[in-house]
Amino acid sequence: MSFKEMPLMSDKKGIVLFYPYIPKKSFSSLKNVLSGRWIGQGPMVDKFEKKFSKKFSNNHSCVATGAGTDALHIAYILAGLKYGDEVIAPVYTCTATNIPFLYMGVKIKFADVDPTTMNISIESVKKLITSKTKAIVCTHYGGLPCDMDELKKIASKNKIPIIEDAA
């Protein structure tokens, strides 16, 4: 089945929010994984991490996580966020974007979204940023990228990281 054969909207089903696409060439690999005895970490995960690291990272190893929330939590820790810090995050996002902040005791300042893209509003970020802001979190909603050029300018000016939630 090709992507063109999977309509995102139909008269019978309405708008399909999550329509998994698994190419037929992946079926045998999936069967091997699912029929294997490894539930979590295992040989296929090791292979994936190595291939991903080689393709997307120069000097760093990549770590596969069980969920996007786990990956974001790790990213927030690696960004140096700690109890009492303040971050700016979009008001419209999956709860997974912000749940780790609750574990960590990080204060969230919610930025409005641009109604045409549903991504974080640059103007809202500019209004919310203070000397207490330790990071900006953005979510690329529905596969539509945020205005990273503008966010990078703000982050650079304030010497803070941007953490992108692309899940």
Sequence positions of predicted segments:
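Conserved coil-to-alpha-helix start sites within the AMP-binding
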Residues: 92-98
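Short N-terminal helix/helix-N-cap motif within the alpha/beta-hydrolase-1
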Residues: 73, 91-92, 146-147
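Generic structural signal for small/hydrophobic residues in well-ordered secondary structure
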Residues: 29-30, 52, 71, 87, ...
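Glycine-/small-residue-rich active-site loops that bind phosphorylated ligands and cofactors
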Residues: 22, 40, 93, 116-117, ...
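Histidine-centered beta-alpha loop that forms part of the nucleotide-sugar donor binding/catalytic region
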Residues: 92, 106, 113, 167
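Active-site phosphate-binding strand-loop segment of PLP-dependent enzymes
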Residues: 116-167
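N-terminal "arm"/small-domain region of PLP-dependent enzymes with the aminotransferase-like
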Residues: 1-39
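Phosphate-binding glycine-rich loop
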Residues: 38-86, 100-104, 110-112
